[in-house]
């Protein structure tokens, strides 16, 4: 039985459809990006983030985006967290772990009537609304989030605990402080 999901979603420009390390896309929708390669569909459930790749090519592809890639400031990340609180209150989600990084988010979410992708959509919408309401997002033409999310179902208590540890430690991998969010519920 599914106990929870580990979901990862990126800000606009974080992980492109033709990302050299692979993506979950089957097409490249922007003509200007096609010169950097076709979609790099993978089916792996393991993280590919640390796979060796041509960083210069990846950064050049990001330069071809319609808008600059999004990287949250610390204040913006706090507003994203405030938006998450509103979504959690709206739908009674239980969050076991959260890391809001400059260009992506990791969450461990308890099983819910809504599918993980619907939950992510709700969280993104509330976070975006909070960024705008706080005056922290001025460019209404520039998207905040990438289109997709990645979700891994966790069906054992061991898997849930492992995912929680991974999410809690994730900021440290980027030289950031550990994060403590008021909306996170301890997993028993």
Q: Model features per residue range: what roles?
A:
Residues 1-188:
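Short catalytic/metal-binding and nucleic-acid-binding patches
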